[in-house]
Amino acid sequence: MILEGGGVMNLNPGNNLLHQPPTWTDSYSTCNVSSGFFGGQWHEIHPQYWTKYQVWEWLQHLLDTNQLDASCIPFQEFDINGEHLCSMSLQEFTRAAGTAGQLLYSNLQHLKWNGQCSSDLFQSTHNVIVKTEQTEPSIVNTWKDENYLYDTNYGSTVDLLDSKTFCRAQISMTTTSHLPVAESPDMKKEQDPPAKCHTKKHNPRGTHLWEFIRDILLNPDKNPGLIKWEDRSEGVFRFLKSEAVAQLWGKKKNNSSMTYEKLSRAMRYYYKREILERVDGRRLVYKFGKNARGWRENEN
């Protein structure tokens, strides 16, 4: 876990541009900076003013835009606000997020110095290549997409089936906009393009939160009593054991502090993208939006 404190950004002293005062006020001139303290969208304000929740929205956006597995970015390591995030150096990002650290750092610098009020900011900024390698089962127990089961006793913890092996995502990236930073030999080696990599073409089942929820609904025999359909034809569903679902999602993301309150906040991220919708006046009830895929009966 990153401790709150003032990290020093590692910028190249030879580059005059990076030593000029930030010009984000012009780039964000049409955005309401103060809205960040009242639930505003993360891309509408400068990162310096993000709340902890908006930091997580930004991380989720990177996962979705680059089609990365949720395990690529450890959200629990970024339980910090925007001021702390902006003070972190590349080395601190790498320590917190491993190979994904360079991606996070570069995108944050782009936002800080070339701020835009746009949710499509990252699509043209990075070309991400993902490859997988087999890892020994003793290292970690993780989700097995085709055989995930839940403890029907619903005790204090809910165990997943152990997977024999898992794929660890390794990220190598090239940027269309380069920021001059001091490079160590190890960093330079990480930036060398991999010899044989394959771009990830689609997400496996359960990669993102809404898919995770969908897959529980689609497997009622394997996942009894957690979530149920209220109206299958309309995509309306209800959480029956909300904390149990939150524990499962937390285990999938290696976040032991996950609660339903945090999970429901993350679900609100999908409202704007019309993947999930509110169901007013009904507690624990949600609806799949027009952009959600794979939940309808007989849908290919």
UniProtKB/Swiss-Prot annotation:
One GO-annotated biological process of the protein: epithelial cell differentiation
Record feature DNA-binding region, as residue ranges: 207-289
Region (Disordered): 183-202
Gene3D superfamilies for the chain: Transcription Factor, Ets-1, Winged helix-like DNA-binding domain superfamily/Winged helix DNA-binding domain
Composition skew (Basic and acidic residues), residue ranges: 185-195
Major place of residence: nucleus
GO cellular component: Golgi apparatus; nucleoplasm
Annotated keywords: DNA-binding, Nucleus, Transcription, Transcription regulation
One Gene Ontology term of the molecular function aspect: DNA-binding transcription activator activity, RNA polymerase II-specific
InterPro entries linked: EHF_SAM_Pointed_dom, Ets_dom, ETS_fam, Pointed_dom, SAM/pointed_sf, WH-like_DNA-bd_sf, WH_DNA-bd_sf
Domain PNT, first and last residues per copy: 29-115
Record flagged with keyword Nuclease: no
Location of the protein in the cell: Nucleus
CDD domains: SAM_PNT-ESE-3-like
Protein function: Transcriptional activator that may play a role in regulating epithelial cell differentiation and proliferation. May act as a repressor for a specific subset of ETS/AP-1-responsive genes, and as a modulator of the nuclear response to mitogen-activated protein kinase signaling cascades. Binds to DNA sequences containing the consensus nucleotide core sequence GGAA. Involved in regulation of TNFRSF10B/DR5 expression through Ets-binding sequences on the TNFRSF10B/DR5 promoter.
Family the UniProt entry places it in: Belongs to the ETS family.
Comment on protein domains: The PNT domain acts as a transcriptional activator.
Annotated protein name in UniProt: ETS homologous factor
